[in-house]
């Protein structure tokens, strides 16, 4: 069909865009972090205007409704513990037109490439192609921001916003398609919760991803082949735990004491062991 021919004709343009956009996000990583910082400042001001006491769930989105109008901005949506039932959510917007120049250029190229197809390929078809790229672009931005925001506390990025002890920041267009950027759960848990969650992880592979363990003692376990990306142990004691072939990419251990532990065969890319103390802990293998 004409639409299939058009898709094939523009496939190289789309591939070039993905490469260009990926490079652009990396090049402008600091600017994307600045977008988050600016949005938090605006959200704090809006919370004060609305008399909003705190937020728990924070969502960044590049909305399709904005993209259709080439209105390149991100929405930051803040809700309290009521989540969807929050009767007074707060929202603010930050312009990102310059950061999304590659997307705008792709749009122009797709329109130009449509010459000769007549009514067989319409504006709706072009928009659908662009919408497919939004999800890929969201993922690129998330990959960069996860690491840019790791030192959020030292940088004071979220200071303007009053948050609950548990709060989470996500990025994506729809709430069920979002990715976590930051999650904090500064609530001390009963020791049994750790064991329960590990047991659940055997059936739910991503159960421990982004999990947060605060001021606890976690001891005497052998954990094999588990997905524990971006897990955090804060001001805790991790004792006699063998992490074997686990994925601990982006994990954090601020103020934590590790005693008699080993990380044989683990993926520790981007792991943060600053401000830790170690006793008889091995990273061999």
Q: Where do the protein language model's features map onto the residues?
A:
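Tandem repeat scaffolds
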Residues: 188-285
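Compact, glycine/acidic-enriched structural inserts
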Residues: 85-125
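Amphipathic, interaction-prone secondary-structure segments
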Residues: 40-79, 166-167, 171-184, 222
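Acidic, proline/glycine-rich low-complexity IDRs
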Residues: 132-226, 231
